[in-house]
């Protein structure tokens, strides 16, 4: 694993798994029924915003995650728990 192979070099290796994300391109093509179905796919009954997804990447790239490696950060609004 990348995290194991490079830990001695103080290199962190993590991944992001993103859930359903709001995007104007999709909203413009969805009927109100499709939009309601997509929104209901998460525990918060809405899609994630792009900035919410980006915050995970910012966290992993920051010093705040200096002791985080070998993990997958799941940002999906509870989609996988549902």
Where are these regions (language model features)?
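Active-site helix adjacent to the Tyr-X3-Lys
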Residues: 1
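Conserved active-site helix of classical SDR/Rossmann-fold NAD(P)-dependent CH-OH oxidoreductases
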Residues: 4, 11, 54-55
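A short hydrophobic alpha-helix cap/turn motif
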Residues: 4-8, 21, 48, 61
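Active-site beta-alpha loop architecture of Rossmann-like, nucleotide-cofactor-dependent enzymes
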Residues: 5, 24, 80
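Short, small/polar-rich loop/turn modules that mediate ligand/substrate recognition or access, typified
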Residues: 7-12, 68-70
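A glycine/serine/threonine-rich, flexible loop-to-helix segment
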Residues: 8, 15-42
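C-terminal substrate-recognition "lid" of short-chain dehydrogenase/reductases
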Residues: 46-75, 80-81
């Amino acid at each position: 694993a990348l995290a194991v192979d490079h830990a001695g070099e103080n290199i962190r290796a993590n991944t992001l798994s993103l859930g359903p994300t709001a995007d104007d391109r999709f909203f413009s093509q969805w009927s109100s029924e499709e939009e309601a179905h997509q929104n209901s796919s998460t525990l918060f009954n809405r899609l994630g915003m792009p900035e919410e997804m980006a915050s995970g990447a910012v966290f992993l790239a920051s010093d705040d995650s200096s002791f985080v490696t070998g993990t997958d950060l799941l940002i999906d609004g509870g989609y996988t728990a549902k």
